[in-house]
């Protein structure tokens, strides 16, 4: 599984994202936002933010791109031309942005700082790049108990699921913003993030939890011996990919092997580690999986994006119980 190395950033990566077709990878870092094809060709750079960028997302049609950063703005771009379409301004940084599954809404999470509480905001989005976008917030959720570090839409935007600094996970009504339920026993304080599929993956220092979005119960737990920064659920195969490594402040005194700067693959059902992929020279800050499950990419503290395409053994690997189930299914 030889990777393609993308080196368009000079500072640490903060998020990487595939578009819906899996042929474009968007990456943001503490310098700017890039777009690259899945085979490593540079497509373009989006200029306009001042300072570090924390988050990026692309709508389902791959026509609109959203970014948020430390300049206290959430921005909307036209993917094809790189044209800045709209800017929403806030009092604090934008830590996470995400389009709804239909692309008609855009969610943003603001930082808690300087007397301003963390908020989750939602805007209606007109998919036409030539149309004027609204500044009116259709939802505004103020997180007065514990700041939201991450949030996203569930399937069909039925819920908004947020992770908080105190380790709790909260479920909000996707239409009204009403608080529906919270689970305070999911993680230790300072939850880092999530990955969304039918269920959520949430992680803290060295543990990943698979959480059901309907009732916020913890379904599975994946424990490692290294700090974690990101996790992703793979389609096609029942795997979870974990990324992390020794804290960035310590990497200058640590070799790549000792720092455990690697992507780790766990079986989603059996919770066992089944493989590792090395290569980064610093912690993995974000991992993202190809929408068709044919590969994954990782963004690191070293400023590189590594794009991996899965080989045949990845798809052939099965536990014996999985092989038996497959044989029984074939005989029906």
From Swiss-Prot:
Q: Where in the cell is it found?
A: Cytoplasm
User: Is Cytoplasm there in the keyword field?
Assistant: yes
Keyword annotations for this protein, in alphabetical order, are: Cytoplasm, Initiation factor, Protein biosynthesis, Repeat, WD repeat
**What's in the GO CC field?**
eukaryotic 43S preinitiation complex; eukaryotic 48S preinitiation complex; eukaryotic translation initiation factor 3 complex, eIF3e; eukaryotic translation initiation factor 3 complex, eIF3m; nuclear periphery
List the InterPro entries hit by this protein, alphabetically: eIF3i (IPR027525), WD40/YVTN_repeat-like_dom_sf (IPR015943), WD40_repeat_CS (IPR019775), WD40_repeat_dom_sf (IPR036322), WD40_rpt (IPR001680)
PROSITE patterns the record matches: WD_REPEATS_1, WD_REPEATS_2, WD_REPEATS_REGION
Give the Gene Ontology MF terms in alphabetical order. Answer: RNA binding; translation initiation factor activity
Pfam families attached to this UniProt entry? EIF3I (PF24805)
Provide one Gene Ontology biological process annotation: cytoplasmic translational initiation
Name the SMART domains on file.
Answer: WD40
- The keyword Ubl conjugation appears for this protein: no
The superkingdom of the source organism is: Eukaryota
Q: Spans of WD repeats, please give.
A: 8-47, 48-87, 144-182, 279-318
Could you describe the subunit structure of this protein?
A: Component of the eukaryotic translation initiation factor 3 (eIF-3) complex.
The task this protein performs is described as:
Component of the eukaryotic translation initiation factor 3 (eIF-3) complex, which is involved in protein synthesis of a specialized repertoire of mRNAs and, together with other initiation factors, stimulates binding of mRNA and methionyl-tRNAi to the 40S ribosome. The eIF-3 complex specifically targets and initiates translation of a subset of mRNAs involved in cell proliferation.
Q: Spell out the family assignment given in the record's similarity comment.
A: Belongs to the eIF-3 subunit I family.
Q: Which PANTHER family match?
A: EUKARYOTIC TRANSLATION INITIATION FACTOR 3 SUBUNIT I
Name of the protein in its database record = Eukaryotic translation initiation factor 3 subunit I
Species per Swiss-Prot/TrEMBL record: Phaeosphaeria nodorum (strain SN15 / ATCC MYA-4574 / FGSC 10173)
| Chain's gene name | TIF34
